[in-house]
């Protein structure tokens, strides 16, 4: 009998670092399943999860403060290897009898750590060798506190000029602490260190692969729904597209996809979705023309949150109407992914602050008596894309820039009108087309056009024109938490601007948004 892909597993306890999800993604890239839980997990929950190793993440708190987060005592009594990263190392040291002090010299950014003695975690892993023969690692630091005294039975395994205990270990208990962040790419050997911990020290097997994830998902879908029919709201985005392919592979024609054309999509997007999933892949797909209904429900609304809620409410009503026509559908499929699950858990505990309401429609109508199928709820976005490729979806679709759930509803500023959407669709298509032509599209993280509800004077030939303004927006980011505006070539911007103004009657001016995040958000609304 083949092994379950979840049999080898690592537990990551989150102490609030901005890099914690990155740790989980790196561990999974190695081929090992892991889950991310809040630091205040109970002993019973850890026992039930039964991990082969535990990682303690970094965090913004200070272990020198009385009420700062601590790892559950059971973590150090569970008999499995433990890796503490940054704050995780500090709380390990403090809880096991060492001491942590605030440092006069804080370390943020690139640093070199020199290996000291022998350590299973670092063995034969280094970037440089000192004249004295010691290995050196290029790493990324981000800490204000430091371990002053390591616990008894621990030894120092790395140091810097300002941090005498940059890493420590208890080889007998297989406890390891590193003051730097192996999960970020700036730590050049970081992935090797995480692999050393997960595979060699914890004894995990590489069971978490795209092909095995697909097989497991299909098996679970079949077990869950049996011979029942399933309905899916297909948007053409990455998540719902991969869900559609997975469920179709599992149950074939018993899946009905509902594609709602709300009039807020990109140019020709509705036809592209129908061609790909209906004609090419042979899915059972129902297209609902709902532009008029959405625009009517949005009339008079200019506040972004009001627009979002109206779009979400109308979608639920339209979708519910279709679902009632499919009397045999007993299951609703959704494209929930792992970060959504983490975000929901954080919100439930009051640890998250809502900046914008979530784009995805949350919850079902009270009278929709259906079970829920969420085949992607264990997966990060990069994993969803990888299995999408394995399922045969085209690269350009899977790696297309993010498009918000409300679509052009949050890219037309103020009140939504069909005229504005039509102008914006064409302007945005020109911008994206030129990015592809210049081979810039996949070098930036997100690019789009925004319709501004203001008019500007222009001149065409000898005639004066007084028409609308659009703004181009293009950013580069790793995690979308922060972003810098893309420094696109002036010549390129000139080509885009000229094409938009010359080819689209109704637009007289094009501007370029040079706001970073923070202080601005990536989307305007």
Swiss-Prot record:
Domain Glutamine amidotransferase type-1 intervals: 9-207
Chemical reaction(s) catalysed: XMP + L-glutamine + ATP + H2O = GMP + L-glutamate + AMP + diphosphate + 2 H(+)
SUPFAM superfamilies: Adenine nucleotide alpha hydrolases-like (SSF52402), Class I glutamine amidotransferase-like (SSF52317), GMP synthetase C-terminal dimerisation domain (SSF54810)
Domain annotation GMPS ATP-PPase: ranges: 208-400
Broad enzyme group: ligase
Positions contributing to ATP binding: 235-241
Subunit structure: Homodimer.
Protein name per Swiss-Prot or TrEMBL: GMP synthase [glutamine-hydrolyzing]
């Amino acid at each position: 009998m083949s092994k379950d892909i979840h049999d080898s597993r690592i537990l990551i306890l989150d102490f609030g670092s901005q890099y914690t999800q990155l740790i989980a993604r790196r561990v999974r890239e190695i081929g090992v399943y892991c889950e991310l839980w809040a630091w205040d997990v109970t002993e019973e929950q850890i026992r039930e999860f039964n991990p082969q190793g535990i990682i303690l993440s970094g965090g913004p708190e200070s272990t020198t403060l009385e009420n700062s987060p601590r790892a559950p005592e059971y973590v150090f009594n569970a008999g499995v290897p433990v890796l503490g990263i940054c704050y995780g190392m500090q709380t390990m040291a403090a809880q096991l009898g060492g001491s942590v002090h605030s440092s006069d010299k804080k370390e943020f950014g690139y640093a070199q750590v020199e290996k000291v003695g022998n350590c299973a975690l670092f063995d034969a892993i280094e970037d440089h060798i000192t004249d004295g023969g010691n290995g050196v690692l290029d790493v990324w630091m981000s800490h204000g506190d430091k371990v002053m005294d390591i616990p008894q039975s621990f030894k120092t395994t790395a140091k810097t000029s300002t941090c005498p205990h940059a890493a420590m270990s208890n080889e007998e208990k297989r406890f390891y602490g590193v003051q730097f962040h192996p999960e970020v790419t700036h730590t050049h050997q970081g992935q090797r260190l995480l692999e050393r911990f997960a595979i060699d020290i914890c004894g995990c097997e590489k069971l978490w692969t795209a092909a095995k994830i697909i097989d497991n998902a299909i098996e679970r879908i079949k077990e869950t729904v049996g011979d029942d029919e399933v309905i899916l709201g297909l948007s053409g985005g990455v998540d719902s597209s991969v869900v559609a392919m997975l469920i179709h592979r599992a149950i074939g024609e018993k899946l009905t996809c509902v594609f709602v054309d709300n009039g807020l999509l990109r140019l020709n997007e509705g036809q592209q979705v129908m061609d790909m999933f209906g004609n090419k892949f042979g899915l059972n797909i129902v297209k609902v023309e709902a532009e008029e209904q959405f625009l009517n429900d949005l009339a008079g609304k200019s506040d972004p949150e009001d627009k979002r809620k109206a779009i979400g409410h109308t979608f639920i009503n339209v979708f519910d109407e279709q679902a009632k026509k499919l009397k045999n559908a007993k299951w609703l499929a959704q494209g929930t992914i792992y970060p959504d699950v983490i975000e929901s858990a954080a919100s439930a505990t009051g640890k998250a602050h809502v900046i914008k309401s979530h784009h995805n429609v949350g919850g079902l109508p009270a009278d929709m008596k259906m079970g829920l199928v969420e085949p992607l709820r264990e997966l990060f976005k990069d994993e969803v894309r990888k299995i999408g490729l394995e399922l045969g979806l085209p690269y350009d679709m899977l790696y297309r820039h993010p498009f918000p759930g409300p679509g052009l509803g949050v890219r037309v500023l103020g009140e939504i009108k069909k005229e504005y959407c039509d102008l914006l669709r064409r302007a945005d298509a020109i911008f994206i087309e030129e990015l592809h032509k210049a081979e810039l599209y996949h070098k930036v993280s997100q690019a789009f056009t925004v319709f501004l509800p203001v008019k500007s004077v222009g001149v065409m030939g000898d005639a004066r024109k007084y028409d609308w303004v659009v703004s181009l927006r293009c950013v580069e980011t790793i995690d979308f938490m922060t972003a810098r505006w893309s420094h696109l070539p002036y010549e390129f911007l000139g080509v885009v601007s000229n094409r938009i103004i010359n080819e689209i009657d109704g637009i007289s001016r094009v501007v370029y948004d040079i706001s970073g995040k923070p202080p601005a958000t990536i989307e305007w609304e």
